[in-house]
């Protein structure tokens, strides 16, 4: 584990260098660190953001500092508190914290051409039929690695290797909310209308981000996800 500065008001706690070598173990370790830091409630820390191999710690420099020292003093002070919260955790704590992120959520997706603008591109790149792409994508189980880019956007690990497809050369300026896409070795869901360069293969009628709810996101880091193929009629029914 290493702790490195990220600007003047954040640190990154990196649990491993590579994700692909041990995906499940790496996500579990990042989630464990995230949960331990949540419980530690270190004064001055204002936000924690888990990712594939790390947790970003955003803080208020004035609240963290007990002196008027230089920036490196702030970083050293906070890094010491972070290590104190993480390193003493026993194996029992490791198992308990890692197990919390195992909620399974089923996401209905309509893969019709009306929503899957790039389904044909994925099929062509992977040398599969469009039906095979849908079947493979909707029978796998995925893990929410992190949330970012826009509020509620889920980066899902676990995409079958035979569905891996490069991002579009020219991103779209506007992608409809609920669009399900493939970008490289990842799949994910656009929660809000936004630009994006992933290959769109379908759309879910579910609302992934609602700022009036607590938490505001339907999915959280560590959650497991399965997609269920639905018809256009089911899409309209679930959207109401």
Regions found by a protein language model. Name each.
Residues 1-96, 101-240:
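Glycine-rich active-site loops that engage anionic ligands at enzyme catalytic sites
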């Amino acid at each position: 584990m290493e702790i490195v500065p990220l600007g003047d008001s954040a640190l990154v706690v990196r649990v491993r260098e590579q994700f692909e070598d041990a995906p499940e173990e790496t996500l579990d370790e990042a989630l464990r660190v995230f949960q331990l830091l949540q419980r530690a409630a270190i004064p001055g820390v204002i936000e924690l953001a888990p990712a594939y191999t790390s947790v970003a710690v955003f803080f208020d420099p004035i609240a963290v500092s007990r002196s008027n020292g230089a920036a490196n003093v702030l970083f050293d002070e906070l890094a010491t508190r972070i290590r104190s919260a993480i390193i003493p955790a026993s194996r029992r704590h490791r198992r308990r914290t890692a197990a919390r992120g195992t909620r399974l959520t089923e996401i209905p997706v309509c893969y019709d051409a009306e929503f899957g603008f790039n389904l044909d591109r994925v099929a062509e790149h992977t040398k599969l039929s469009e039906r095979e792409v849908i079947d493979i994508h909707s029978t796998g189980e995925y893990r929410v690695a992190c949330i970012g880019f826009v509020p509620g956007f889920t980066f899902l690990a676990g995409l079958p290797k035979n569905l891996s497809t490069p991002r579009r050369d020219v991103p779209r300026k506007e992608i409809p909310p609920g669009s399900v896409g493939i970008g490289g070795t990842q799949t994910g869901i656009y929660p809000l209308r936004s630009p994006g360069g992933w290959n769109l293969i379908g759309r879910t009628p579910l609302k992934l981000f609602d700022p009036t709810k607590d938490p505001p996101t339907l999915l959280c880091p560590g959650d497991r996800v399965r997609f269920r193929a639905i018809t256009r009629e089911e899409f309209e029914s679930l959207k109401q």
